[in-house]
Design a protein with these regions (language model features):
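A structural signal for short secondary-structure junctions
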Residues: 124-126, 137-139, 150-153, 159-164
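Short, surface-exposed loop or secondary-structure junction motifs
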Residues: 1-145
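Glycine-centered structural positions embedded in regular secondary structure
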Residues: 129-131, 167, 182-184
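Short, well-ordered beta-strand elements
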Residues: 144-147, 155-159, 164-175
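Glycine-enriched catalytic-core subsegment of oxygenase/oxidase enzymes
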Residues: 133, 145-146, 151, 178
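Short, gly/Ser/Thr-rich active-site loops of penicillin-recognizing serine hydrolases
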Residues: 174-202
């Protein structure tokens, strides 16, 4: 849909209309990024003597597929739901844009109306808006809004409290993916440790 109405390739649209305006370094097209900034991702395999295996496919180039790219059809090569390459610092800035209803440091990415729609859950069963989840299962007593990610051994979490205006981002890899109430236990502990020691004590 985005490519049809914008006429831009998905990765270029995200870079031109979101990343660059916010001053963020990242993207979906591996070939356009500095490989020196990539960190090796490791997949944890509990069934194989707790072995950690590198996941080189995470940075597989797409130059051959891009040569024959067709808008609206070839888009999945970028894994739009989880293929973004970005640092925790820049992901936190992106999160802050959502927390402030579409703007970050004077740069408007989406309207407040659109931001509210994205953050409003569509059903009580799933608690999801448009890619953003509402939950009280992450930090006790807090209604948090955000998103999690997992691919090639990487696990990430980006959640903010729209009322108290604080947010937490954490990215890790090579952990045993045990989940409780929908959240990776390692990331849940990390988020609560950061909250208890850096935010709640203020």
């Amino acid at each position: 849909v985005l490519e049809k109405f914008s006429g831009e390739r998905f990765d270029n649209y995200v870079k031109n209309h979101i990343l660059n305006p916010l001053g963020l370094y990242g993207g979906y097209c591996v070939d356009s990024l500095d490989k020196q900034k990539f960190v090796t991702l490791y997949e944890y395999n509990a069934k194989n003597s707790n072995h950690f295996s590198p996941s080189p496919a995470a940075y597989h180039p797409r130059r051959d597929e891009i040569k024959n790219y067709t808008l609206g059809y070839t888009t999945p090569i970028f894994s739009p739901t989880g293929g973004m390459k970005i640092s925790a610092t820049d992901l936190a800035k992106y999160m802050t844009m959502h927390m402030y209803k579409g703007s970050y440091k004077g740069t408007k990415i989406i309207s407040k109306k659109s931001a509210k729609i994205m953050q409003t859950k569509l059903s009580d069963e799933e608690n999801y808006g448009l890619a953003l989840l509402q939950t009280t299962n992450l930090i006790e007593g807090k209604l948090m809004v955000g998103h999690t990610g997992s691919a090639y051994g990487l696990y990430s979490i980006m959640f903010f409290d729209p009322k108290e205006e604080f947010g937490i981002v954490a990215i890790t890899n090579g952990c045993n993916p045990v989940y409780t109430k929908g959240f990776n236990d390692a990331l849940r502990r990390t988020v609560n440790t950061l909250y208890n020691n850096l935010i709640m004590k203020k």
